[in-house]
Amino acid sequence: VDRKTQEEREMSMNRGFFRIVSTGHYTPEMILSNKDLEQMVDTSDAWITERTGIRERHIANGKTTSDLAVIAAQRAIDRIGYDKEKIDLIIVATFTPEMKIPGVASRVQAKLGLDKPGILAFDINAACTGFIYALNIAERMLSNDTYRSALVIGAEVISKVTDYRDRNTCILFGDGAGAVILEKDETKEVIFHVSSKGDTELILCAEDHISMDGQKVYQFASKAMAASIREVMSYGDISRSSIRKIIPHQANIRIIQSASKALDIPLDAFYINIQKYGNTSAASIPIALDEMLEEETPASDEKVLLVGFGAGLTSGACALSF
């Protein structure tokens, strides 16, 4: 590896410390199945399932992004009886805010009744990689001891920017929110890899509807997912045997299968719930993380890897300790 390439790799990596003290998620009650989509566009349940792995997706049906975010956040708070007054940082990753200003994070703050002095609340938009970017930002802010407790949320209402006449995109997306509460903990190391290519063409939501070049996105995503996992494992000296689960952004089962093959890591090491929710963008990783932690408890010496990719073209991964 030449010196410049090595320096570029180092710049995309960082390590820090935090503990995830609780998680929560929410998906709306309304379900749009593949059978429903058969009545709306020229497609079939078998075609969608075979090519994407998606069987159904949840639709907000009038609920806003902050509505979903607050329910996910409240579930994370209630799960362990967390004192919400300890929260002094709120970051929401989304590309579907219900209004331009105020941001979703400010609305979450208001709905949770958190009005103490010094609290910081803001949104970020890194598309489907947004949750990993938000975790990275939260870690940096917790590390300087100014903030003690961060509420990080990925929340999307993609149905409002989905063209249900476009069979190439309407089959893919769903609505939902996932939340985590973080506290600084010097015993819990976290490794991050984040990147952006500065692409403005492959995935767009310029006006009312999302559009994408599916084949080129697939090519980028398959490589980016495997590359980010490799970078995190290498930088953190993480062995395959120490990985409890890999939680990928849930965009397409074929992308996950491709990464599994490229890494020579069995598919059952990847947590997959795309069949239930479709692509929920920034919400997909925290939703999957919450579901995974409901099903199993990683040991203290095991790692959970999160990996995402999205418009921009952004990508990122992180290795968590529990």
What are the roles of these predicted feature ranges?
Residues 9-62, 164-223, 227-230, 309, ...:
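Condensing-enzyme catalytic core mediating Claisen C-C bond formation in acyl metabolism
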Residues 66, 70-73, 96-97, 110, ...:
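Claisen-condensing/thiolase-fold acyl-transfer catalytic domains that form or cleave C-C bonds
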Residues 20-22, 48, 76, 90, ...:
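Buried hydrophobic positions in well-ordered alpha/beta secondary-structure cores of metabolic enzymes
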Residues 79, 83-114:
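Anion-binding (especially nucleotide phosphate/pyrophosphate-binding) glycine-rich loop
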